[in-house]
Amino acid sequence: QVVYTAAIHPDNPEYAQAVRAGIPMMARAELLGQIMANYKTAVNIAGTHGKTTTTSMLSEILLAADADPTISVGGILKDIGGNIRIGRSDLFVTEACEYTNSFLSFNPTMNIILNVKEDHLDFFKDLADIRASFRRFVERLPEGGTLIINSDIEDYEYFFKGLNVKVITVGSDPDKSTYSARGIAYDDLGRCHYTLLKNGEPYGIGEESSIDLMVPGIHNVYNSLAAIAAALELDIPIAAIKKGLAEFYGTNRRFERKGVFNG
C-alpha cells in the first residue's frame, strides 16, 4: 500500500505509477485517523500556525510526566530524535493540519484550536471556508469530548455552538479565558516568563503559577497556554508541566538558533 501526503497530487510520477500498477492508495491523514482510533485519548492540535510548536510543548510536558505518549509532530523534536515516537500508553498526540481538510479524517477525543486565519487559499475559497472546515473538525469530537480554543479568535463560539463538548478557553483576556497570562516579561533573548491565571486568578499555590519558557515571543505564551490547558485536562501535575516547558528549546526550523554571525 502507498501512503501519500496532502502535498502529493495525481500528476506526481510515483503516485501515477502506483495507480497504474493497481497498488492500494491511502492518504496520510486517513492512516493517522485509523491509528488514533485505537487510543483511548487522542489529542489533535490545529491552527493556522503554532501547531508544531504547541504539539512539541505538550509532548515535552507528557515526557516530563512519564506519560509515555505516542507522538506525531510536523517537525523534528530533538528529545525524541525525530518526528515520531511510539509510546506504550493509551495516549496519542498529533498536530492536525487543515490543508485539503486532512484533519477531518482524524478521530480525536480532545481538539485544540490555536488560531484560524487565511491560509492554503489554493484549496480553500476564503476565510469563511476555512472557518467552516475548523467547525467540522470540532464536530469530529465525540459527545463530551474536549475542545481547547483561543478566545482571541473572532466569534470563537461559532466553532462549538450547539455541540455537546467541554470547552476550555485560553487567550489574552482573563474575563473570557479559562487560562491566561499576567505579568509577561522577557529576558534579553526574548524568552518569556509569566504568571499563569485560571479564571482570572493565579493558578495553584505559591510558585505553581510561575511559568518560564525557553522559546521567545508572545505567540509562544499563547501556544504554551494551550499546551498547559491540555496537560491539566489530562491530569498532568503542574510540576511536570513547568519542567516540560522549561526544558523545551524549540523544534528544528521553527525560529531555530543556527549560530552567531561573525561569532
Regions found by a protein language model. Give the residues of each.
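Cytosolic ligand/metal-binding cores
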Residues: 2
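Phosphate-binding loop of NTP-binding sites
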Residues: 6-151, 155-166, 225, 229-234, ...
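Adenine nucleotide phosphate-binding catalytic loops in nucleotide-utilizing enzymes
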Residues: 124-131, 145, 161-263
